[in-house]
Regions:
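Glycine/serine-rich phosphate-binding loop and adjoining beta1-alpha1 elements at the start
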Residues: 2, 8, 79-127
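Glycine-rich phosphate/dinucleotide-binding loop and adjoining beta-alpha-beta core of small-molecule
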Residues: 69-73, 77-83
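Short phosphate-binding/catalytic loops that engage adenosine nucleotides
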Residues: 31, 55, 112
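Short acidic low-complexity segments
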Residues: 54-67
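Redox-cofactor binding/interface segments in oxidoreductases and associated redox assembly factors
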Residues: 5, 66, 72-73, 92-93
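N-terminal beta-loop-helix "entrance" segment that forms/cooperates
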Residues: 34-57
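Glycine-rich phosphate/diphosphate-binding loop of Rossmann-like nucleotide-binding domains
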Residues: 6-42
Length: 127
């Protein structure tokens, strides 16, 4: 699978969807991981750490959305990101859809497969 990790663009959001350690696990299992350049800086991870973990650094979020089968984020996609989601592309992130009618409709219209972290449970119903 080709997994993309764009830089978070929501104000005050400094986290990133995958750490270098997570990238290493994914790449060692045969996945290709694309990480937006400087995407992890505010979370304490530099580009070299991602490269050493096996990630390919990409200049623009648009290229990550265009080239990835799976997108891994932290926060809900903003409107310009929603427009980049492709049909059948899998998006893992917090979505908080209950209070976001416009976001909900945009995701429906994208025909992507959007999985909200806050709704994922184990076999016992635990988050």
């Amino acid at each position: 699978m080709k997994i993309g990790v764009p830089k978070e663009i929501k104000p005050q959001e400094n986290r990133i969807g995958l750490t270098p350690d997570s990238v290493k696990v994914l790449t060692s299992n045969g996945n290709e991981v694309l990480v937006e350049k400087n995407g992890g800086l505010e979370a304490g991870f530099d580009n070299e750490q991602y490269k050493n973990a096996g990630a390919k650094l990409v200049d623009k979020a648009e290229d990550i959305f265009n080239d990835s089968e799976i997108i891994v984020k932290v926060k809900e996609p903003l409107s310009n990101e929603v427009k980049m989601i492709k049909e059948n592309q899998i998006v893992f992130t917090y979505l908080h859809l209950a209070a976001a009618k416009e976001l909900t409709q945009g995701l429906i219209d994208s025909k992507g497969v959007c999985i909200a972290y806050e709704t994922v449970t184990d076999n016992n119903g635990r988050l």
